[in-house]
């Protein structure tokens, strides 16, 4: 097997990535496959942190738009990410991988509080760390949480696993002429409003020079291929590096 290209990564997954073909919840087959691939990468010596969204269980923004208090809705969304984190922890432990779920909101009987130094120590010991409950603050997405945690723990790159193999100029499922980008700058993403992550997350990565790769997590073996450099998605980085 090829050697890993990174020492420490942060993998961002949407909650929807856990649904598979279902309309709601967690697909056992999907979460087992993801856990197997994460375990395979971990055994290569790569330190892995993850942030998972909660949209497969609850979408706070949707209910807020329908009239629910936004702060309450966002808190409910944070709890959904804890549920996903616990599910992934269980799947990883079935793979024989030590895993810790660390929450940005206190829920001590279920998982650890997020403490940066402790998280880094877990990673150094070879444990997979799942960061749950977003940033712990309303009005911030799990993409922003992923950017923040990647920077805090000193990840080499943030990998965003999606249902497409990169960033396109338009929705490739609707526009046959949509162009796939190999490389983008942070400013291009912001100026062209490309659907990589929300603007807050992109600006945070830009200001701290955290590289982003968007790739297709639904393709079996994709994570291992990305880590070993056999496959790439769309890279987002500073303009002076292109």
Swiss-Prot record:
- The UniProt record lists the keyword ATP-binding: yes
| Enzyme Commission (EC) number | 2.7.4.22
> Which reaction is this enzyme known to catalyze?
UMP + ATP = UDP + ADP
Q: Residues that bind UMP, according to the entry?
A: 54, 74, 135-142
Superkingdom of the source? Answer: Bacteria
Q: Which GO terms describe its cellular component?
A: cytosol
HAMAP family to which the protein is assigned, alphabetical: PyrH_B (MF_01220_B)
This one is known as: Uridylate kinase
The UniProt gene name for this protein comes to: pyrH
